[in-house]
From Swiss-Prot:
InterPro entries: Phage_head_morphogenesis_dom, PRibTrfase_dom
Family, as annotated: To E.coli plasmid IncP-alpha RP4 protein TraN.
Lineage: Bacteria, Pseudomonadati, Pseudomonadota, Gammaproteobacteria, Pasteurellales
Superkingdom per UniProt: Bacteria
Protein name as it appears in the record: Uncharacterized protein HI_1407
A family per Pfam: Phage_Mu_F
C-alpha cells in the first residue's frame, strides 16, 4: 500500500462523511446469468444429441429395457465429450464478468471517495498492482467455477447411465433423468451468477479500500424480508477488514449475501457511530417530491377484478400467454382514451414494473404494457428492473411501508415515461419507480 488516505485527511476537521455503499452491479449479474444460461443450454443440448447418436432413437425408445451394450456406448460418448476442451469458453465468460464488475466497482468507489474527501483517486486505483492481482484471482476462480458446472453435470450424467444399467431402467426413464439433470445444472449456474456478483463486488471494494489505507467499514444490510438475522443484526456496526466477523465473514462473502460495506476513516469513526443519518439515508428507498401539476394516477378497474380473474394466478407466476390474455380482458377503452389525452404528441415510452428472473416472475405489468403499446402505438421499455423482492401481496399498510422495492437499470433520456403496475394499493411500488426515474433526470408521466 503506497497511500494512507486517513493520514492525509487527519488534519482536516472531523465531520460525518456520508459515504455511500457500493452495491453490486445488477447489469453485470444479468449479463453473467445470461452467459451461464447459454453455456448450460449449449452443453446439455450437445450431450443429449450425442447420447442419441450411438443408439439412433435412444430417447424415443419406450419399450426396451436398458442394455449393458447401450451403457458402454453411451459412456464412450460421454468420455469423448468430457475430453473436449472448453477452457477458452469458460475464460471468455469469466473475463467478461469480472471486467464488467471491476469497471463498475472502480467507478463507484473512486467517485464515492472523491465526493467525500475531495481527492481523486481514480488513476491511482486503476493502476494498482494489488487490485490487478485481485482481479486476476477472481477471474481464475470464476473460470474454475464455470468448468465445475460442466464437470459436475457430466459426472452426474455418467452416474445416471451406470445406475440405469444396474437397475435395468427403461430408456425413456433415463432420458427424463438426464433432462432433469440439465434443469438442476441451470439452477446451479444461476446461483453462481448471483453469489459471485456479490462476492466480486465485496472483494474489489475491500481491495480498493485497503489500497488507500481504509481499515474499517460499517456493515450495511439490505433490511428487506430476505436478509438473514445474523446479517441484519450487524447493520450499522463497525468492523475491521483484518478481523472479519466469525459467523458471517465480511459483507458479500457469505453465500447469496447482499450486504455491503461503507468505508470508515479512523478520525471519523465516533461521528459515524453517533450519526444514524449516514446509514439510514441509504436504507430509504429512492423517492422524490410530488409536484402539484403531476398527473393523477389512472386506475383502470377495481383491485379485485384482476385477482378474481381465472388466469390471474398463472399470470402472476410467470405464464406469458395467460398474462397477455388477462391484460386484454382487463384493459378498458376508457383508460386508453385517458392515456391518449395525457400523452398527446409527446415522445413517450411505457415502463412496466417488472423484476429480474431471480426476484420475481409476475408477467402481468409487462402484458398490460404490451396491450397498451398496440393501442397507443408507444414502445415498451424493459431496461429498468425491480432489483429486490418484497412479496407484499396481501400485506398490511405497515408491511408495505417497511418493505419498499428498489430498482436498477439504464433510464432512457429525453422521453416521457408512462409507468404502470398491475395493482395499486398504497402506491409504494410506483412511487419507488418514479423516484428512481427522477433521480436519472427522465421526464415522466404516471399510470
Amino acid at each position: 500500500m503506497l497511500m494512507n488516505l486517513p493520514e492525509i485527511l487527519k488534519n482536516q476537521k472531523a465531520r460525518a462523511r456520508k459515504f455511500k455503499p457500493v452495491k453490486m452491479s445488477k447489469r453485470t449479474e444479468l449479463w453473467y446469468r445470461q452467459q451461464l444460461k447459454q453455456f448450460v443450454k449449449m452443453m446439455t443440448n450437445d450431450v443429449e444429441r450425442a447420447l442419441q447418436q450411438p443408439q439412433g432413437s435412444f430417447f424415443m425408445d419406450d419399450a426396451k429395457g436398458f442394455q449393458a451394450i447401450s451403457a458402454k456406448a453411451l459412456m464412450k460418448v460421454l468420455e469423448k465429450y468430457e475430453k473436449s476442451d472448453r477452457t477458452s469458453q469458460a475464460e471468455n465468460i469469466a473475463n467478461g464478468f469480472v471486467s464488467r464488475g471491476d469497471a463498475q466497482n472502480h467507478a463507484e468507489v473512486s467517485t464515492n471517495l472523491k465526493n467525500q474527501t475531495g481527492i481523486d483517486l481514480s488513476a491511482y486505483l486503476r493502476n494498482s498492482p494489488n487490485i490487478t492481482e485481485k482481479v486476476n484471482a477472481l477471474t481464475a476462480g470464476n473460470i474454475q467455477l464455470i468448468k465445475s458446472i460442466r464437470s459436475q453435470y457430466l459426472d452426474k450424467v455418467q452416474n445416471a447411465v451406470m445406475q440405469a444399467m444396474v437397475r435395468g431402467s427403461l430408456n425413456k426413464d433415463l432420458a427424463a433423468q438426464i433432462k432433469d439433470l440439465g434443469k438442476t445444472t441451470e439452477k446451479r449456474a444461476m446461483f453462481i451468477a448471483r453469489d459471485q456478483s456479490s462476492k466480486l463486488n465485496a472483494a474489489l471494494t475491500q481491495a480498493r479500500h485497503e489500497e488507500v489505507g481504509i481499515k474499517k467499514y460499517m456493515w450495511s444490510a439490505s433490511l428487506d424480508e430476505r436478509v438473514r438475522e445474523s446479517h441484519a443484526e450487524k447493520d450499522g456496526q463497525i468492523f475491521e477488514y483484518a478481523n472479519p466477523p466469525a459467523d458471517t465473514d465480511h459483507p458479500g462473502h457469505d453465500f447469496n449475501c447482499r450486504c455491503v460495506q461503507i468505508p470508515v476513516l479512523d478520525n471519523n469513526e465516533q461521528i459515524v457511530k453517533n450519526s444514524p443519518i449516514v446509514s439510514q439515508q441509504e436504507k430509504q428507498q429512492m423517492r422524490s417530491e410530488w409536484s402539484d401539476d403531476f398527473p393523477d394516477t389512472i386506475i383502470d378497474r377495481k383491485l379485485g377484478d384482476a385477482t378474481s380473474h381465472p388466469l390471474y394466478e398463472n399470470a402472476k407466476k410467470g405464464s406469458i400467454e395467460d398474462a397477455y390474455q388477462l391484460a386484454k380482458d382487463l384493459v378498458t377503452d376508457d383508460a386508453v382514451n385517458k392515456l391518449k389525452q395525457l400523452v398527446g404528441n409527446k415522445n413517450a415510452i411505457l415502463i412496466p414494473v417488472h423484476a429480474e428472473e431471480a426476484v420475481g416472475q409476475n408477467m402481468i405489468p409487462v402484458a398490460i404494457a404490451t396491450v397498451l403499446s398496440k393501442k397507443l402505438h408507444i414502445p415498451v421499455d424493459l431496461s429498468i428492473v425491480q432489483a429486490t423482492k418484497v412479496s407484499r401481496t396481501g400485506g398490511d399498510g405497515w408491511h408495505r411501508l417497511v418493505y419498499s422495492p428498489a430498482f436498477d437499470g439504464i433510464v432512457p433520456k429525453d422521453k416521457y415515461a408512462i409507468i404502470l403496475d398491475d395493482t395499486q394499493t398504497q402506491g409504494g411500488t410506483l412511487a419507488s419507480l418514479k423516484g428512481y426515474i427522477i433521480k436519472e433526470k427522465l421526464l415522466h408521466l404516471m399510470l
